[in-house]
């Protein structure tokens, strides 16, 4: 089990945690943002250290014990049950980043695509709210100008 294997397996585990725990507890935006933070943590570090990872990536501290419990339950499936430190393989981070779904699909046939390169933008410039009058959720997106494509 080399660093490539460990990096991919740990990120796949994070993906499942995001889908099975973060999404039901929060929403699709938070699921995508969690994976954004996880990928970026791996991208900017050469060594993985689980405590530092959890402190940086978990914006909701209540998810830290849930993550640890989830790792006890599902870690063996990803061969990471006893792993908390390993060297990070940058090529593996790039491979996993390509496979991630970063689109919020709404029931109104509208899709919002969030960029994995700059996750801070999604947190700073996208807000979710509830409209009492329409009895619907909405996303509010802030920007300076549209890019002509």
Where are these regions (language model features)?
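C-terminal, beta-strand-rich globular interaction domains
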Residues: 69-149
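Long, hydrophobic alpha/beta structural blocks
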Residues: 1-96
């Amino acid at each position: 089990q080399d660093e490539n294997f460990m990096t991919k397996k740990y990120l796949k585990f994070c993906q499942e945690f995001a889908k099975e725990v973060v999404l039901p507890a929060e929403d699709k935006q938070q699921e995508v943002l969690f994976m954004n933070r996880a990928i970026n943590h791996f991208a900017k570090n050469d060594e993985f250290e689980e405590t530092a990872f959890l402190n940086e990536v978990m914006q909701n501290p209540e998810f830290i014990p849930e993550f640890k419990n989830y790792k006890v339950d599902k870690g063996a499936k990803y061969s990471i049950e006893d792993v908390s430190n390993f060297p990070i393989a940058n090529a593996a981070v790039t491979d996993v980043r390509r496979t991630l779904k970063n689109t919020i699909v709404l029931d109104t046939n509208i899709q919002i695509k969030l960029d994995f390169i700059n996750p801070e933008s999604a947190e700073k410039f996208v807000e979710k709210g509830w409209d009492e009058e329409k009895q619907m959720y909405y996303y509010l997106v802030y920007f300076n100008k549209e890019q002509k494509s």
